[in-house]
Amino acid sequence: MSKPTVGINGFGRIGRLVLRAAVEKDSVNVVAVNDPFISIDYMVYLFQYDSTHGRFKGTVKHEGDYLIVANEGKSQHKIKVYNSKDPAEIQWGAAGADYVVESTGVFTTIEKANAHLKGGAKKVIISAPSADAPMFVVGVNHEKYDHANDHIISNASCTTNCLAPLAKVINDNFGIIEGLMTTVHAVTATQKTVDGPSGKLWRDGRGAGQNIIPASTGAAKAVGKVIPELNGKLTGMAFRVPTPDVSVVDLTARLEKPASLDDIKRVIKAAAEGPLKGVLAYTEDQVVSTDFVSDTHSSIFDAGASIILNPNFVKLISWYDNEFGYSNRVVDLISYIATKA
């Protein structure tokens, strides 16, 4: 079977890392990129040099209006570059892109993302939560994808991708009565380097490098969309902290069935080595956040940091590279839905 052909709209943090993940996984073929704000020579530079994940280990250059990306032992990607502001104008079909990753953060509804289908794309994967597109978390509910009807889908958020596999394992084994999630989250591009105006959410406009900033997140409630049994049982919030990448979820939950910490560790380790291998990982090491930069998992359970008050009340800790782990799942989701075509 030929590899799925992919277009990327928006060559920002996620767009570029989806391309890196695609090159490393070698499971999809990226054939087009669109970004109205980045010239092709600037794309080469931004892809090659990354302050967080380091220099790209392969080669990247441009020939005419094509990016040529290659890495030793991996397939070469010859990528047509577009600079359209209107997604309906991007010639995905002409470039041969069947699957479009919508990573601008702008076209996150079915109506807006539908513009990509007009340009010849067959499916759109939104790399953000969506108000109305069905959300899929690889390892949790990706098998509910319906090829006949799901043309525009969401890969949910990086935090939902971390929390959902953990919540699934705990709920399947012990049952979750209710839970609260906190994510201690690295800075992202929407934040300000110094204090500035920020619409209705005044705190979000404060300097990212000098503050711990309480923020809202829909990630916990979104778990109820991907695991219907948990609908209405989880909510959460975020603290934005001055680190460039890697975040950590703290899930505090009441369990239906009593469990020891060893019981919990055992079922998570079994899932990480079995059905959720590659998505969920398990560590007993004395780790800190930078140990997970460029980690490809959605969620890495920290056995040593997790605690219990009593057999029905637990606090579980799980790390995630909110950029690269998530980008790898975007590629995995495309690989999966392509098998249903």
UniProtKB/Swiss-Prot annotation:
What organism is this sequence from?
Caenorhabditis briggsae
Alphabetized Gene3D superfamilies for the sequence: Dihydrodipicolinate Reductase, domain 2 (3.30.360.10), NAD(P)-binding Rossmann-like Domain (3.40.50.720)
Q: What is its EC number?
A: 1.2.1.12
Its family?
A: Belongs to the glyceraldehyde-3-phosphate dehydrogenase family.
Functional pathway:
Carbohydrate degradation; glycolysis; pyruvate from D-glyceraldehyde 3-phosphate: step 1/5
Which sites bind D-glyceraldehyde 3-phosphate?
Answer: 157-159, 188, 217-218, 240
The name this protein carries in UniProt is: Glyceraldehyde-3-phosphate dehydrogenase 2
Parts forming coiled coils: none
